[in-house]
Amino acid sequence: MIWRTILFAFATAAYADYDCHVSLWRGESLSFLLPDEACEVSGEAPGIEVQTGTLLPVRYLADNAALEYKTVADRAVYGSRAPGVHFATVMASRGADSGSYRFGNLVVTVVDRTLPPPKEWKYYLDLWQHPWAVARVNGCEPFSPSHYKAMEPLWRQLADAGQKTLTVTLVDRPWNKQCRDAYHSMVVRRKDAMGKWSFDYSRFDEYVVFGRACGIGPHISCYTMCPWEYVVDYEGPDGTTVKMVAKPGTAEFDDYWHDFLEDFERHLKEKGWLSDTYVAMDERSPEDLDYIAKFVRHVAPGLKISVAGNRPLSAFAGIDIDSYSHSFRRMDDQFIRDALLRKRQGLITTYYVCCEPPRPNTFMGSGAGEAFVCSFYPVVLNLDGFLRWAYNSWGEDPLRDMTYRRWASGDTALVYPDGSPSWRFLELKNGIQQAEKFCILHDMGARKDDLDELRRMFVLRDVQTGTDYARLRDKVIEILNKR
Protein backbone atom coordinates (compact mmCIF):
# COMPACT_ATOMS: atom_id res chain seq x y z
CA MET A 1 0.00 0.00 0.00
CA ILE A 2 1.11 3.53 -0.69
CA TRP A 3 1.01 5.48 2.55
CA ARG A 4 0.37 9.19 2.40
CA THR A 5 3.24 11.44 3.45
CA ILE A 6 2.43 12.86 6.85
CA LEU A 7 0.90 16.31 6.59
CA PHE A 8 2.24 18.40 9.44
CA ALA A 9 3.36 21.48 7.68
CA PHE A 10 1.39 23.80 9.71
CA ALA A 11 2.60 21.94 12.70
CA THR A 12 5.52 20.37 14.42
CA ALA A 13 5.31 16.92 15.94
CA ALA A 14 7.21 16.24 19.16
CA TYR A 15 7.65 12.54 18.58
CA ALA A 16 9.27 11.95 21.96
CA ASP A 17 5.98 12.54 23.75
CA TYR A 18 3.73 12.25 20.67
CA ASP A 19 2.45 15.81 21.05
CA CYS A 20 1.11 17.16 17.76
CA HIS A 21 0.74 20.89 17.14
CA VAL A 22 -1.53 22.56 14.57
CA SER A 23 -2.46 26.20 13.98
CA LEU A 24 -5.43 27.69 12.17
CA TRP A 25 -7.57 30.80 11.91
CA ARG A 26 -11.02 31.21 13.39
CA GLY A 27 -13.57 29.98 10.84
CA GLU A 28 -11.10 27.52 9.32
CA SER A 29 -11.42 23.75 8.91
CA LEU A 30 -8.04 22.07 8.66
CA SER A 31 -7.41 18.39 7.87
CA PHE A 32 -4.15 16.58 8.55
CA LEU A 33 -2.69 13.12 9.04
CA LEU A 34 -1.96 11.94 12.56
CA PRO A 35 1.72 10.99 12.90
CA ASP A 36 1.26 7.83 14.92
CA GLU A 37 -1.46 5.66 16.41
CA ALA A 38 -0.08 6.67 19.80
CA CYS A 39 -1.17 10.27 19.17
CA GLU A 40 -4.29 10.18 21.34
CA VAL A 41 -6.86 12.86 20.50
CA SER A 42 -9.52 13.58 23.11
CA GLY A 43 -11.20 16.34 25.06
CA GLU A 44 -13.29 19.44 24.34
CA ALA A 45 -12.86 23.20 24.11
CA PRO A 46 -15.39 25.98 23.48
CA GLY A 47 -15.70 26.84 19.79
CA ILE A 48 -13.34 24.10 18.62
CA GLU A 49 -14.37 20.76 17.17
CA VAL A 50 -11.98 17.90 16.46
CA GLN A 51 -13.02 14.90 14.38
CA THR A 52 -10.80 11.90 13.73
CA GLY A 53 -11.03 8.98 11.37
CA THR A 54 -9.23 6.55 9.10
CA LEU A 55 -8.23 6.80 5.45
CA LEU A 56 -9.54 3.50 4.10
CA PRO A 57 -7.70 1.83 1.21
CA VAL A 58 -9.19 2.05 -2.28
CA ARG A 59 -8.01 0.17 -5.36
CA TYR A 60 -6.94 1.98 -8.51
CA LEU A 61 -5.22 1.36 -11.83
CA ALA A 62 -1.68 2.62 -11.33
CA ASP A 63 -0.16 1.68 -14.70
CA ASN A 64 -2.41 1.55 -17.75
CA ALA A 65 0.14 -0.13 -20.01
CA ALA A 66 1.00 -2.90 -17.55
CA LEU A 67 -2.54 -3.10 -16.09
CA GLU A 68 -0.96 -2.79 -12.64
CA TYR A 69 -3.36 -2.14 -9.75
CA LYS A 70 -2.47 -0.70 -6.36
CA THR A 71 -4.32 0.52 -3.28
CA VAL A 72 -3.98 3.87 -1.58
CA ALA A 73 -5.34 5.24 1.70
CA ASP A 74 -7.79 7.80 0.29
CA ARG A 75 -11.38 7.40 1.52
CA ALA A 76 -11.69 9.59 4.62
CA VAL A 77 -14.18 8.00 7.03
CA TYR A 78 -14.84 10.08 10.15
CA GLY A 79 -15.34 8.10 13.34
CA SER A 80 -13.52 5.04 11.99
CA ARG A 81 -10.94 3.41 14.24
CA ALA A 82 -9.88 0.84 11.67
CA PRO A 83 -6.16 0.07 11.43
CA GLY A 84 -4.26 2.12 8.90
CA VAL A 85 -3.66 5.80 8.19
CA HIS A 86 -5.43 8.06 10.66
CA PHE A 87 -6.36 11.69 10.21
CA ALA A 88 -8.07 14.55 12.00
CA THR A 89 -10.04 17.63 11.02
CA VAL A 90 -9.99 20.62 13.37
CA MET A 91 -12.69 23.28 13.02
CA ALA A 92 -12.46 26.59 14.87
CA SER A 93 -15.68 28.58 14.99
CA ARG A 94 -15.65 32.26 14.12
CA GLY A 95 -16.48 32.93 17.76
CA ALA A 96 -13.60 30.91 19.19
CA ASP A 97 -11.09 32.67 21.41
CA SER A 98 -7.53 32.82 20.14
CA GLY A 99 -4.98 30.81 22.08
CA SER A 100 -3.75 27.23 22.47
CA TYR A 101 -5.90 24.26 23.48
CA ARG A 102 -4.97 20.68 24.33
CA PHE A 103 -6.88 17.65 23.06
CA GLY A 104 -4.90 14.78 24.50
CA ASN A 105 -1.67 14.70 22.49
CA LEU A 106 -3.02 17.26 20.02
CA VAL A 107 -2.35 20.95 20.69
CA VAL A 108 -4.47 23.36 18.63
CA THR A 109 -3.51 27.03 18.35
CA VAL A 110 -6.21 29.42 17.16
CA VAL A 111 -4.65 32.47 15.51
CA ASP A 112 -6.25 35.87 16.09
CA ARG A 113 -7.56 36.19 12.54
CA THR A 114 -10.90 35.15 11.06
CA LEU A 115 -11.78 33.37 7.84
CA PRO A 116 -15.29 34.35 6.64
CA PRO A 117 -17.95 31.75 5.73
CA PRO A 118 -17.36 29.89 2.43
CA LYS A 119 -20.22 31.76 0.78
CA GLU A 120 -18.23 34.98 1.23
CA TRP A 121 -14.91 33.71 -0.08
CA LYS A 122 -13.55 35.49 -3.14
CA TYR A 123 -11.94 32.26 -4.34
CA TYR A 124 -13.74 30.89 -7.41
CA LEU A 125 -14.12 27.11 -7.14
CA ASP A 126 -15.79 25.22 -9.98
CA LEU A 127 -15.95 21.43 -9.55
CA TRP A 128 -18.52 19.97 -11.94
CA GLN A 129 -21.29 17.96 -10.32
CA HIS A 130 -23.00 14.87 -11.81
CA PRO A 131 -26.54 14.28 -10.44
CA TRP A 132 -27.15 11.15 -12.55
CA ALA A 133 -24.12 9.38 -11.06
CA VAL A 134 -25.65 9.86 -7.59
CA ALA A 135 -28.95 8.41 -8.82
CA ARG A 136 -27.28 5.31 -10.27
CA VAL A 137 -25.14 4.36 -7.26
CA ASN A 138 -28.11 4.86 -4.90
CA GLY A 139 -30.67 3.10 -7.10
CA CYS A 140 -32.87 6.22 -7.21
CA GLU A 141 -35.15 7.63 -9.86
CA PRO A 142 -33.38 10.80 -11.06
CA PHE A 143 -34.68 13.90 -9.27
CA SER A 144 -37.00 11.95 -7.02
CA PRO A 145 -37.14 12.86 -3.30
CA SER A 146 -34.74 10.00 -2.51
CA HIS A 147 -32.32 11.27 -5.15
CA TYR A 148 -32.27 14.77 -3.70
CA LYS A 149 -31.77 13.28 -0.24
CA ALA A 150 -28.75 11.33 -1.52
CA MET A 151 -27.27 14.37 -3.26
CA GLU A 152 -27.68 16.79 -0.37
CA PRO A 153 -24.71 15.80 1.85
CA LEU A 154 -22.40 15.67 -1.17
CA TRP A 155 -23.54 19.06 -2.45
CA ARG A 156 -23.31 20.64 1.02
CA GLN A 157 -19.78 19.29 1.41
CA LEU A 158 -18.89 20.97 -1.88
CA ALA A 159 -20.50 24.23 -0.78
CA ASP A 160 -18.37 24.12 2.39
CA ALA A 161 -15.31 24.17 0.14
CA GLY A 162 -16.52 27.42 -1.44
CA GLN A 163 -18.13 26.13 -4.67
CA LYS A 164 -19.34 29.09 -6.73
CA THR A 165 -21.30 27.49 -9.56
CA LEU A 166 -23.98 24.85 -10.11
CA THR A 167 -23.50 22.50 -13.07
CA VAL A 168 -26.72 22.23 -15.12
CA THR A 169 -27.42 20.74 -18.55
CA LEU A 170 -29.39 22.22 -21.44
CA VAL A 171 -28.96 19.21 -23.77
CA ASP A 172 -28.55 15.45 -23.53
CA ARG A 173 -24.97 14.15 -23.36
CA PRO A 174 -23.10 17.47 -23.63
CA TRP A 175 -19.86 15.45 -23.36
CA ASN A 176 -21.15 12.61 -25.53
CA LYS A 177 -20.32 9.25 -23.86
CA GLN A 178 -17.34 10.37 -21.81
CA CYS A 179 -18.80 9.38 -18.41
CA ARG A 180 -20.06 6.09 -16.96
CA ASP A 181 -23.45 7.79 -16.44
CA ALA A 182 -25.01 9.94 -19.13
CA TYR A 183 -25.87 13.55 -18.39
CA HIS A 184 -29.39 14.36 -19.58
CA SER A 185 -31.10 17.64 -20.31
CA MET A 186 -32.75 19.55 -17.47
CA VAL A 187 -34.91 21.33 -20.04
CA VAL A 188 -37.60 19.53 -22.03
CA ARG A 189 -38.08 20.92 -25.55
CA ARG A 190 -40.91 20.24 -27.97
CA LYS A 191 -41.55 21.22 -31.55
CA ASP A 192 -45.12 21.15 -32.85
CA ALA A 193 -46.38 20.44 -36.35
CA MET A 194 -46.21 24.15 -37.19
CA GLY A 195 -42.53 24.31 -36.26
CA LYS A 196 -43.07 26.23 -33.02
CA TRP A 197 -40.79 25.47 -30.07
CA SER A 198 -41.94 25.18 -26.45
CA PHE A 199 -39.86 24.58 -23.33
CA ASP A 200 -40.46 23.05 -19.90
CA TYR A 201 -38.07 24.31 -17.19
CA SER A 202 -39.60 22.41 -14.26
CA ARG A 203 -36.58 20.18 -13.58
CA PHE A 204 -34.11 23.00 -14.19
CA ASP A 205 -35.93 25.24 -11.71
CA GLU A 206 -36.24 22.53 -9.08
CA TYR A 207 -32.56 21.65 -9.31
CA VAL A 208 -31.35 25.26 -9.15
CA VAL A 209 -33.45 25.87 -6.04
CA PHE A 210 -32.02 22.69 -4.49
CA GLY A 211 -28.41 23.57 -5.32
CA ARG A 212 -28.75 27.04 -3.86
CA ALA A 213 -30.39 25.65 -0.73
CA CYS A 214 -27.29 23.46 -0.32
CA GLY A 215 -25.13 26.59 -0.49
CA ILE A 216 -23.77 26.20 -4.04
CA GLY A 217 -23.69 29.30 -6.17
CA PRO A 218 -24.64 31.92 -6.96
CA HIS A 219 -23.59 31.12 -10.52
CA ILE A 220 -25.33 28.64 -12.82
CA SER A 221 -23.18 27.04 -15.53
CA CYS A 222 -25.37 25.77 -18.39
CA TYR A 223 -23.86 23.07 -20.62
CA THR A 224 -24.03 23.70 -23.47
CA MET A 225 -24.74 25.32 -26.85
CA CYS A 226 -21.87 23.32 -28.32
CA PRO A 227 -22.12 19.65 -27.30
CA TRP A 228 -19.33 17.42 -28.52
CA GLU A 229 -21.48 15.90 -31.28
CA TYR A 230 -23.59 19.06 -31.85
CA VAL A 231 -26.74 16.99 -31.20
CA VAL A 232 -29.90 18.50 -29.69
CA ASP A 233 -32.72 16.09 -28.80
CA TYR A 234 -36.33 17.23 -28.80
CA GLU A 235 -39.83 15.83 -28.73
CA GLY A 236 -41.50 15.93 -32.13
CA PRO A 237 -45.21 16.46 -32.91
CA ASP A 238 -45.95 12.72 -32.55
CA GLY A 239 -44.17 12.46 -29.19
CA THR A 240 -41.09 10.65 -30.48
CA THR A 241 -37.55 11.82 -29.79
CA VAL A 242 -35.82 13.56 -32.69
CA LYS A 243 -32.04 14.00 -32.81
CA MET A 244 -31.02 17.17 -34.63
CA VAL A 245 -27.46 18.12 -35.52
CA ALA A 246 -27.19 21.86 -34.81
CA LYS A 247 -23.67 23.00 -35.59
CA PRO A 248 -22.87 26.69 -35.10
CA GLY A 249 -23.42 28.57 -38.34
CA THR A 250 -26.14 26.26 -39.66
CA ALA A 251 -29.84 27.01 -40.10
CA GLU A 252 -30.68 24.31 -37.54
CA PHE A 253 -28.51 25.99 -34.93
CA ASP A 254 -29.91 29.45 -35.60
CA ASP A 255 -33.53 28.28 -35.61
CA TYR A 256 -33.41 26.31 -32.38
CA TRP A 257 -31.03 28.36 -30.28
CA HIS A 258 -32.62 31.69 -31.23
CA ASP A 259 -36.02 30.61 -29.95
CA PHE A 260 -34.58 28.88 -26.90
CA LEU A 261 -32.33 31.75 -25.81
CA GLU A 262 -35.12 34.31 -26.11
CA ASP A 263 -37.41 32.14 -23.99
CA PHE A 264 -34.67 31.13 -21.55
CA GLU A 265 -33.65 34.75 -20.93
CA ARG A 266 -37.28 35.65 -20.27
CA HIS A 267 -37.62 32.74 -17.83
CA LEU A 268 -34.40 33.60 -15.98
CA LYS A 269 -35.53 37.20 -15.59
CA GLU A 270 -38.77 36.00 -14.01
CA LYS A 271 -36.84 33.79 -11.58
CA GLY A 272 -34.29 36.51 -10.75
CA TRP A 273 -31.40 34.34 -11.96
CA LEU A 274 -30.37 36.03 -15.21
CA SER A 275 -27.31 37.90 -13.92
CA ASP A 276 -25.93 34.67 -12.42
CA THR A 277 -26.36 32.44 -15.48
CA TYR A 278 -23.59 31.42 -17.89
CA VAL A 279 -23.78 29.57 -21.19
CA ALA A 280 -20.80 27.24 -20.72
CA MET A 281 -18.55 25.61 -23.32
CA ASP A 282 -15.83 23.04 -22.75
CA GLU A 283 -12.74 22.85 -24.98
CA ARG A 284 -14.50 23.91 -28.17
CA SER A 285 -12.87 25.42 -31.24
CA PRO A 286 -12.30 29.18 -31.50
CA GLU A 287 -14.52 29.23 -34.58
CA ASP A 288 -17.47 27.66 -32.74
CA LEU A 289 -16.94 29.85 -29.68
CA ASP A 290 -16.76 33.04 -31.71
CA TYR A 291 -20.03 32.26 -33.46
CA ILE A 292 -21.81 31.28 -30.24
CA ALA A 293 -20.59 34.28 -28.24
CA LYS A 294 -21.77 36.73 -30.90
CA PHE A 295 -25.06 34.84 -31.25
CA VAL A 296 -25.74 34.98 -27.50
CA ARG A 297 -24.83 38.66 -27.25
CA HIS A 298 -27.28 39.41 -30.08
CA VAL A 299 -30.22 37.22 -29.00
CA ALA A 300 -29.96 37.13 -25.18
CA PRO A 301 -27.48 39.80 -24.07
CA GLY A 302 -28.27 39.27 -20.38
CA LEU A 303 -26.60 35.85 -20.42
CA LYS A 304 -22.87 35.46 -19.73
CA ILE A 305 -20.33 33.24 -21.49
CA SER A 306 -18.09 30.69 -19.74
CA VAL A 307 -15.30 28.76 -21.47
CA ALA A 308 -12.74 26.12 -20.52
CA GLY A 309 -9.99 26.36 -23.12
CA ASN A 310 -7.09 24.05 -23.98
CA ARG A 311 -5.42 26.39 -26.49
CA PRO A 312 -3.34 29.53 -26.07
CA LEU A 313 -5.54 32.41 -24.95
CA SER A 314 -4.54 34.26 -28.12
CA ALA A 315 -6.58 31.68 -30.07
CA PHE A 316 -9.71 33.23 -28.54
CA ALA A 317 -8.72 36.85 -29.20
CA GLY A 318 -11.75 39.01 -29.89
CA ILE A 319 -14.21 36.55 -28.32
CA ASP A 320 -16.22 38.04 -25.46
CA ILE A 321 -15.74 35.59 -22.56
CA ASP A 322 -16.94 36.49 -19.05
CA SER A 323 -15.44 33.48 -17.25
CA TYR A 324 -12.42 31.73 -18.72
CA SER A 325 -10.55 28.69 -17.37
CA HIS A 326 -7.20 27.84 -18.94
CA SER A 327 -5.56 24.44 -19.18
CA PHE A 328 -2.76 24.34 -16.60
CA ARG A 329 -0.62 22.42 -19.07
CA ARG A 330 -0.70 25.47 -21.38
CA MET A 331 0.08 28.05 -18.72
CA ASP A 332 2.86 30.47 -19.62
CA ASP A 333 4.04 33.97 -18.75
CA GLN A 334 1.94 35.52 -21.52
CA PHE A 335 -1.22 33.96 -20.13
CA ILE A 336 -0.41 35.29 -16.66
CA ARG A 337 -0.10 38.80 -18.11
CA ASP A 338 -3.37 38.38 -20.04
CA ALA A 339 -5.12 37.09 -16.91
CA LEU A 340 -4.07 40.18 -14.96
CA LEU A 341 -5.62 42.35 -17.67
CA ARG A 342 -8.84 40.33 -17.45
CA LYS A 343 -8.89 40.81 -13.67
CA ARG A 344 -8.63 44.57 -14.11
CA GLN A 345 -11.64 44.34 -16.43
CA GLY A 346 -13.66 42.53 -13.76
CA LEU A 347 -13.65 39.19 -15.63
CA ILE A 348 -13.23 35.76 -14.01
CA THR A 349 -10.09 33.78 -14.86
CA THR A 350 -9.10 30.38 -13.44
CA TYR A 351 -7.06 27.38 -14.51
CA TYR A 352 -7.98 23.71 -14.65
CA VAL A 353 -6.41 20.28 -14.52
CA CYS A 354 -8.06 17.15 -15.92
CA CYS A 355 -6.46 13.97 -17.33
CA GLU A 356 -3.37 16.13 -17.69
CA PRO A 357 -0.87 17.29 -16.57
CA PRO A 358 0.69 14.28 -14.83
CA ARG A 359 1.55 16.65 -11.97
CA PRO A 360 0.38 18.51 -10.06
CA ASN A 361 -3.00 16.82 -10.06
CA THR A 362 -5.60 15.10 -7.89
CA PHE A 363 -5.17 11.52 -9.12
CA MET A 364 -5.17 8.52 -6.80
CA GLY A 365 -1.43 8.21 -7.38
CA SER A 366 -0.64 11.92 -7.02
CA GLY A 367 2.05 12.76 -4.50
CA ALA A 368 1.73 14.56 -1.18
CA GLY A 369 0.90 18.23 -1.57
CA GLU A 370 -0.16 18.09 -5.22
CA ALA A 371 -3.88 18.67 -4.60
CA PHE A 372 -3.01 21.49 -2.19
CA VAL A 373 -0.81 23.21 -4.76
CA CYS A 374 -3.48 22.81 -7.45
CA SER A 375 -5.93 24.88 -5.43
CA PHE A 376 -3.53 27.33 -3.78
CA TYR A 377 -1.36 28.30 -6.74
CA PRO A 378 -4.01 30.35 -8.63
CA VAL A 379 -3.85 33.21 -6.12
CA VAL A 380 -0.07 33.41 -6.47
CA LEU A 381 -0.68 34.01 -10.19
CA ASN A 382 -3.42 36.61 -9.53
CA LEU A 383 -6.06 34.21 -10.87
CA ASP A 384 -9.50 33.87 -9.32
CA GLY A 385 -9.55 30.15 -8.60
CA PHE A 386 -9.60 26.57 -9.82
CA LEU A 387 -11.76 24.35 -12.04
CA ARG A 388 -11.91 20.58 -12.31
CA TRP A 389 -14.30 18.65 -14.50
CA ALA A 390 -15.43 15.95 -12.10
CA TYR A 391 -16.52 16.16 -8.50
CA ASN A 392 -18.45 12.88 -8.53
CA SER A 393 -18.47 11.23 -11.95
CA TRP A 394 -17.97 7.73 -10.55
CA GLY A 395 -17.04 4.48 -12.25
CA GLU A 396 -18.65 1.12 -11.58
CA ASP A 397 -17.79 0.47 -7.91
CA PRO A 398 -16.18 3.63 -6.51
CA LEU A 399 -16.26 2.69 -2.82
CA ARG A 400 -13.78 -0.09 -3.58
CA ASP A 401 -12.16 0.89 -6.87
CA MET A 402 -11.58 4.38 -8.32
CA THR A 403 -10.62 2.98 -11.73
CA TYR A 404 -12.61 4.20 -14.72
CA ARG A 405 -11.66 2.62 -18.03
CA ARG A 406 -7.99 3.44 -18.65
CA TRP A 407 -8.17 7.02 -17.46
CA ALA A 408 -5.89 8.20 -14.69
CA SER A 409 -7.60 6.86 -11.58
CA GLY A 410 -9.15 9.62 -9.50
CA ASP A 411 -9.62 11.89 -12.53
CA THR A 412 -13.37 11.35 -12.40
CA ALA A 413 -14.16 11.91 -8.71
CA LEU A 414 -12.99 13.62 -5.52
CA VAL A 415 -15.62 12.17 -3.18
CA TYR A 416 -17.24 8.80 -2.51
CA PRO A 417 -20.92 7.83 -2.83
CA ASP A 418 -21.41 7.42 0.92
CA GLY A 419 -20.49 11.08 1.43
CA SER A 420 -16.89 10.39 2.46
CA PRO A 421 -14.41 12.90 1.05
CA SER A 422 -11.21 11.68 -0.49
CA TRP A 423 -7.94 12.71 1.11
CA ARG A 424 -7.33 14.49 -2.20
CA PHE A 425 -10.47 16.60 -1.67
CA LEU A 426 -9.47 17.46 1.90
CA GLU A 427 -6.03 18.60 0.71
CA LEU A 428 -7.71 20.60 -2.06
CA LYS A 429 -9.93 22.28 0.54
CA ASN A 430 -6.90 23.03 2.73
CA GLY A 431 -5.33 24.78 -0.25
CA ILE A 432 -8.47 26.78 -0.98
CA GLN A 433 -8.63 28.08 2.58
CA GLN A 434 -4.96 29.06 2.55
CA ALA A 435 -5.57 30.83 -0.77
CA GLU A 436 -8.43 32.79 0.76
CA LYS A 437 -6.22 33.73 3.71
CA PHE A 438 -3.51 34.86 1.29
CA CYS A 439 -6.06 37.14 -0.44
CA ILE A 440 -7.33 38.53 2.87
CA LEU A 441 -3.82 39.45 3.99
CA HIS A 442 -3.05 40.93 0.58
CA ASP A 443 -6.20 43.07 0.59
CA MET A 444 -5.37 44.27 4.10
CA GLY A 445 -1.86 45.23 3.04
CA ALA A 446 -0.61 42.97 5.82
CA ARG A 447 2.46 40.72 5.91
CA LYS A 448 3.72 41.94 2.53
CA ASP A 449 7.20 40.46 2.97
CA ASP A 450 5.73 37.05 3.80
CA LEU A 451 3.39 37.09 0.82
CA ASP A 452 6.23 38.12 -1.47
CA GLU A 453 8.27 35.24 -0.10
CA LEU A 454 5.45 32.83 -0.95
CA ARG A 455 5.24 34.19 -4.49
CA ARG A 456 8.97 33.70 -5.00
CA MET A 457 8.72 30.08 -3.88
CA PHE A 458 6.41 29.18 -6.76
CA VAL A 459 8.23 29.00 -10.11
CA LEU A 460 5.79 28.19 -12.92
CA ARG A 461 8.04 25.83 -14.86
CA ASP A 462 8.98 23.92 -11.69
CA VAL A 463 5.35 23.59 -10.62
CA GLN A 464 4.39 22.34 -14.09
CA THR A 465 7.17 19.79 -14.48
CA GLY A 466 7.53 18.49 -10.94
CA THR A 467 8.84 19.87 -7.68
CA ASP A 468 8.60 19.20 -3.95
CA TYR A 469 4.89 19.97 -3.65
CA ALA A 470 4.77 18.86 -0.01
CA ARG A 471 7.49 21.36 0.88
CA LEU A 472 5.57 24.14 -0.87
CA ARG A 473 2.40 23.16 0.99
CA ASP A 474 4.20 23.06 4.32
CA LYS A 475 5.79 26.47 3.86
CA VAL A 476 2.51 28.09 2.78
CA ILE A 477 0.68 26.89 5.88
CA GLU A 478 3.56 27.79 8.16
CA ILE A 479 3.74 31.37 6.87
CA LEU A 480 0.00 32.05 6.69
CA ASN A 481 -0.58 30.77 10.23
CA LYS A 482 2.02 32.94 11.91
CA ARG A 483 0.60 34.49 15.06
What label would you give each PLM region?
Residues V231-D233, V245-G249, F253, W257-T277, ...:
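Catalytic domains of carbohydrate-active enzymes that cleave complex glycans
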Residues L34, V279, K304-G309, D322-R329:
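Short, hydrophobic beta-strand segments that form beta-sheet elements in well-ordered domains
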Residues A14-L33:
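Beta-sheet-dominated interaction scaffolds and their linkers
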Residues L33, E37-R75:
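Surface-exposed binding patches on compact interaction domains or structured appendages
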Residues M1-F8:
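Sec-dependent signal peptide recognition
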Residues S323-M402, R406-W407:
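Catalytic-core region of carbohydrate-active enzymes that cleave or remodel glycosidic bonds
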Residues G79, F87-R94, S100-V299, A308-G318, ...:
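Aromatic-lined carbohydrate-binding surfaces of glycoside hydrolases
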